[in-house]
């Protein structure tokens, strides 16, 4: 699970971005049609966790793991991630891209146990919500 602070307010409270992305030899990512040679599907689920008149805190879950997938999805939504000037953000008040992995899990390669790590949202203090991700 990821959390992002985005500029503006999405039109809907939740949604899914399903798109096709392609990388060039310089690792730049573009949104393309599914028939474009080398394109890969990208599926991003999101929901608004909190918002004010300027920014929204978005919870994000991905089905695929494409380079810049979340950044491209938020840009297409019309709400670029705060600090992500490459993908359309007009603001960078924290001198960083406000995208953070709040929960990561994987099967341990030696024990085969499922291991999960969680962390606080470093920019959640923008709101009056707890900085722990909701479960």
What is the role of each PLM region?
Residues 1-135:
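RNA pseudouridine synthases
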